[in-house]
A protein has these predicted regions:
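Conserved AMP-binding/adenylate-forming
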Residues: 1-74, 81-83, 96-97, 132
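General small-molecule cofactor/ligand-binding pocket signal
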Residues: 157-160
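AMP-binding/adenylate-forming catalytic core of the ANL superfamily
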Residues: 37, 42-43, 65-152, 162-164, ...
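Residue-level detector of flexible, active-site-proximal loop/helix-junction positions
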Residues: 15, 20, 90, 164, ...
Length: 189
């Protein structure tokens, strides 16, 4: 997540209502990032089904949720596939991670969904703590409550010695989530 700048010349980008991609969101409102222009690819070779899923009319569906700021800059919020649905609300992991990374006891963080029996998820934070720092779940909850809407506050905080990352050092949320689920299963036994 973060700012990606303004669209390239001859490229149009718009933020669409996720529930109705024909509707453009007002500036400052989150939505699905769509793009079109001469440099956008035309589709997947020999895969019409994937091409249809990747486009809404002539607009390419980037797979990102973002905001068009009033100055025309685009801020990415999260990947659509990483959205956590809790209590009927959408939580974008990147937004919660951004807040937690500002906390002095946290070196790095991955916010993921912990599956519940009813099919929804709990928002949880997997933390790589700064050296010499102890996990303080209540302190972290209070810190988050002061900065986030109630439903975005992680229910639980887990300490990890190391969070799964790719070669570029970017957190791999799906791997962290899988590591968490394995850990929780092992704790049940």
């Amino acid at each position: 997540p973060g700012y990606v700048g303004i669209p390239f010349p001859d490229t149009e980008v718009r933020i669409a209502n996720p529930d109705n991609l024909d509707e453009t969101q007002p500036d400052g409102t989150e939505g699905e990032v769509l793009a079109r222009g001469p440099q956008i690819f035309k589709g997947y070779l020999n895969n019409e089904e994937a091409t249809e899923a990747a486009f809404h009319g002539e607009w390419f569906r980037t797979g990102d949720m973002g905001v068009m700021e009033e100055d025309g800059f685009i801020r990415l919020v999260s990947r659509i596939k990483e959205i956590i649905i809790t209590g009927g609300f959408n939580v974008y992991p990147g937004e919660v991670e951004e807040i937690l990374r500002e906390h002095p006891s946290i070196d790095d963080v991955a916010v993921v969904g912990r599956p519940r029996e009813d099919g929804s998820e709990d928002v949880v934070a997997c933390l790589d703590l700064a050296d010499g720092t102890a996990l303080d779940p209540e302190g972290l909850k209070e810190y988050c409550r002061e900065r986030l809407t109630r439903y975005k506050v992680p229910r639980t905080f887990y300490h990890f010695e190391e969070l799964a990352k790719d070669q570029m050092g970017k957190i791999r949320r799906r791997e962290v989530q899988a590591d968490l689920i394995r850990r929780l299963e092992a704790e049940k036994d």
